[in-house]
């Protein structure tokens, strides 16, 4: 099971990376997207499976009639958990991709304020619907609406020519969040 998940993650990431490199995107953005969560498919699968009570632990991974009733039901749970794991990782990639478009002046202004979150809802047909950037610091600093109209147009263009093209046909809507560490710019 673990070997299959690792093999699938390598194939999935290779296809994703090839799609990105065939598009007209800056090397910086490509590096950001490609480097995020490269080998986390297996871990994410176990996380999702445990939440859904599909696996009781990382060490109890096998099928049993007693636990699942039928192998068909086991396969359904497995496929559902795996699909959700891939979707979660897609969400993280997308969040990182969007974060890479934040203007440097805003990154400098934020400075070393702790952890931040970018939350987004995306649709193939509607583009970037909603986003927010929250900085968690001692003072509870919150920063929002940091993209200009031109920034948004650049994001939409990059999404249209790269990420959306790599999505499965049946995925029209994606929502999620990316947590990032703000770097000290001094």
Where are these regions (language model features)?
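Charge-biased low-complexity segments
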Residues: 23-186
């Amino acid at each position: 099971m673990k070997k299959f998940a690792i093999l699938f993650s390598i194939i999935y990431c290779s296809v994703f990376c090839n799609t990105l490199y065939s598009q007209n995107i800056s090397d910086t953005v490509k590096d950001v997207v490609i480097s995020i969560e490269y080998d986390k498919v297996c871990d994410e699968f176990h996380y999702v499976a445990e939440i859904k009570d599909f696996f009781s632990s990382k060490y109890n991974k096998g099928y049993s009639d007693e636990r699942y009733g039928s192998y068909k039901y086991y396969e359904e749970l497995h496929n559902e958990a795996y699909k959700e794991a891939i979707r979660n990782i897609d969400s993280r990639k997308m969040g990182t991709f969007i974060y890479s478009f934040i203007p440097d002046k805003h990154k400098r202004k934020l400075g070393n304020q702790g952890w931040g979150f970018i939350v987004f809802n995306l649709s193939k047909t509607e583009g970037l619907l909603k986003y927010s950037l929250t900085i968690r610091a001692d003072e509870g600093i919150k920063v929002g609406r940091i993209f200009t109209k031109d920034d948004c147009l650049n994001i939409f263009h990059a999404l249209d020519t790269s990420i959306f093209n790599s999505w499965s046909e049946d995925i029209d809507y994606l929502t999620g969040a990316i947590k990032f560490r703000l770097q000290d710019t001094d």
